[in-house]
Amino acid sequence: MTLSEKIVDYVISLNKKEIPEMVYLKAQEHFQDTVACIMAGAGKEAIRLAVDYCVETTGSNASSVIGYKDVKLNSGNAAMVNAMAAHICDYDDMSMELNGHSSTVLVPTVLAVGEEMQCSGTEILDAYITGIQINSVLGRLVANTKIDPGWNLTSLVGIFGATIAAGILYKPVSYTHLRAHE
């Protein structure tokens, strides 16, 4: 069994009802903090340029860009722009297990896909928590790996948690999601 298959099996086996209430409360807190970071970064010139580029090249779609009332992009571009805005002021959360910024990658992803798929708030939060779990597990696995300057675990590991979280919201979670990161 490949590592990707093991990760998907782990995700499928998770029972959200076993997640302690404190985890949900902390997840809501980190989620709200990340949305605040996105709002703080939304007006920065680099974000405006990214929004303009995405609108010009892909047009309107189903997912909102926070801070831009009338702008909707495809879920991938909305997640990208919102993630850029979340990190641009560098106030985003820090995961000690990942040694990176999980929420910066996950919140924009689950918001964009959740809006596209018309998911409930609970479904979005569950996908976010699962993404955090995946990033934390993978972060611990590579914790002692030497990372070259210019790279960090947010970009190297965060894609896996974000892919899993998006896959959960696109439903159903299965081995078909394995190809999403390839």
What is each PLM-predicted segment?
Residues 98-103, 125-128, 146-159:
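Active-site nucleophile and cofactor-binding loops and adjacent substrate-binding regions
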Residues 1-99:
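Terminal-appendage/accessory-domain detector
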Residues 34-41, 102-122, 160-171:
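Alpha-helical support elements that line or immediately flank enzyme active sites
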Residues 113, 128-138:
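Acidic, glycine-rich active-site loops and adjacent beta-strand->loop/helix elements
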Residues 176-182:
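Conserved small/polar residues in nucleotide/adenosyl-binding loops
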Residues 59-62, 134-142:
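Secretory-pathway/luminal and periplasmic proteins that interact with or process carbohydrate-rich
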Residues 86-95, 138-149:
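Glycine/charged-rich beta-loop-alpha catalytic/anionic-binding loops adjacent to active sites
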